[in-house]
Amino acid sequence: MEVIKISPRGYCYGVVDAMVLALRTAQNFDLPRPIHILGMIVHNAHVVEAFEKQGIKTLDGEDRLALLDQVQEGTIIFTAHGVSPEVRKKARDKGLTVVDATCPDVTKTHDLIREKVAEGYHVLYIGKKGHPEPEGAMGIAPDHVHLVQKLEELEALDLPTDKLIVTNQTTMSQWDVKHLMDAILKRFPGVEVHNEICLATQVRQEAVAEQVGEADLCIVVGDPRSNNSNRLAQVSEEIADVPSYRIADLFELDIEWLRGKKNVAVTSGASTPTPLTKEVITFLEQFDEFNPATWEKKRTVNMAKILPTVK
C-alpha cells in the first residue's frame, strides 16, 4: 500500500514543552509530593498513562476549580490548555506548589482578553464547549467573555458594538473559525478581530488540505478528546473531500476501511506521540488486502518510552 505521510504532523512545541516540564517536575525531588496534573496534560490517554508510571496522577474532568478539591497538598501542574485566574488563586490559597505548563499561544490569548476587558470591551470567544481552553479563557472575565460555538448562539447575543472584539480557541479549524467570523462581522460590523489559531494548528490543517488530495483515505492518529486531531479529520473530509478516520492508535484501525484503497494518507494530532504514528505508517506500508499474513496488528512501540526526552 502507498502511504502519503502528511508533513508537518504530530507534536507541536507547546505540547513538547508541557510534557518536558511535567517530566522535570517528576524528577525534581525538592518539589513536594504528591504531584497531580489538573486535567490531561495534553489530550492523549497514552500520554496520561505514561505520566502515571512516572508517579504523576492526572485529575480528569471539565471543571478545573472543582478538581482542585481533590488535592490537599503537594504540587499541581497546570496543563497546556491554561486555567482561569480563579483556579490559580484557589491553588495558591490551598498552599500548593504550582507548575504552569500553559502553552505560550494560550497565554497570549489570555493576555489579550485581560487587556481588552480592562478597556471596557466585551469578548466573543469562538470555541468548543466543555474544552479546557475556553474554560480558562472565559474564567478571566466571565461577565465579559461570551463563548460562541454555533450560529444560533451568536444570534441570541445582545452586546454593545462600540467596544467588542472576537477571538478564538487556538486549536479550532481555521475554516470553522472563518465561518463564524464572517457571521460575527455581519452581525457586528465594527467588531475588532483577533484570530488566535496557533501556527502549529494552522500549518497542520493546511498540510492536510494541500497534501491529502491524491489519497483514497486519510487516517488521523489522535486521541478522541484531542480537538486538533478531530479537526484534521474534518479538514480532510470537508475541505479536501477525502474520507477520513481518527484512531487513537494502530489497534483502532479497521482493516475493512483499507479494502480497495491504493493510497492512504496519514497525519497525527499535536498531542500524539510520534512512535504511535510511525507504528501505523509501518503497518500500512506492508499491508496487502490480498495477503492475510499482512493483516495482523502488533504492538511494536515501547509504551514506556513515548514521552519526549528530557535533556
Swiss-Prot record:
For this UniProt entry, the molecular function terms from Gene Ontology, in alphabetical order, are: 4 iron, 4 sulfur cluster binding; 4-hydroxy-3-methylbut-2-enyl diphosphate reductase activity; metal ion binding
Binding positions for [4Fe-4S] cluster? 12, 103, 198
InterPro entries assigned to the protein according to its UniProt record, in alphabetical order: LytB/IspH
Q: Where does isopentenyl diphosphate bind?
A: 43, 81, 131, 226, 228, 271
The annotated pathway is: Isoprenoid biosynthesis; dimethylallyl diphosphate biosynthesis; dimethylallyl diphosphate from (2E)-4-hydroxy-3-methylbutenyl diphosphate: step 1/1; Isoprenoid biosynthesis; isopentenyl diphosphate biosynthesis via DXP pathway; isopentenyl diphosphate from 1-deoxy-D-xylulose 5-phosphate: step 6/6
Q: Name one GO biological process term.
A: isopentenyl diphosphate biosynthetic process, methylerythritol 4-phosphate pathway
Cofactor binding note of this UniProt entry = Binds 1 [4Fe-4S] cluster per subunit.
Q: Which residues bind (2E)-4-hydroxy-3-methylbut-2-enyl diphosphate?
A: 43, 81, 131, 170, 226, 228, 271
Q: Which UniProt keywords apply?
A: 4Fe-4S, Iron, Iron-sulfur, Isoprene biosynthesis, Metal-binding, Oxidoreductase
The answer to whether the entry has keyword Lipid biosynthesis is: no
The EC number on file is 1.17.7.4
Iron-sulfur as UniProt keyword:
yes
Q: Indicate the secretion signal residues.
A: none
Essential cofactor(s)? [4Fe-4S] cluster
Q: Where does dimethylallyl diphosphate bind?
A: 43, 81, 131, 226, 228, 271
Catalytic reactions of this protein:
isopentenyl diphosphate + 2 oxidized [2Fe-2S]-[ferredoxin] + H2O = (2E)-4-hydroxy-3-methylbut-2-enyl diphosphate + 2 reduced [2Fe-2S]-[ferredoxin] + 2 H(+); dimethylallyl diphosphate + 2 oxidized [2Fe-2S]-[ferredoxin] + H2O = (2E)-4-hydroxy-3-methylbut-2-enyl diphosphate + 2 reduced [2Fe-2S]-[ferredoxin] + 2 H(+)
Q: Where is the active site?
A: 133 (proton donor)
Q: Which family does it belong to?
A: Belongs to the IspH family.
Entry function: Catalyzes the conversion of 1-hydroxy-2-methyl-2-(E)-butenyl 4-diphosphate (HMBPP) into a mixture of isopentenyl diphosphate (IPP) and dimethylallyl diphosphate (DMAPP). Acts in the terminal step of the DOXP/MEP pathway for isoprenoid precursor biosynthesis.
What is the name attached to this protein's record? 4-hydroxy-3-methylbut-2-enyl diphosphate reductase
Species annotation: Brevibacillus brevis (strain 47 / JCM 6285 / NBRC 100599)
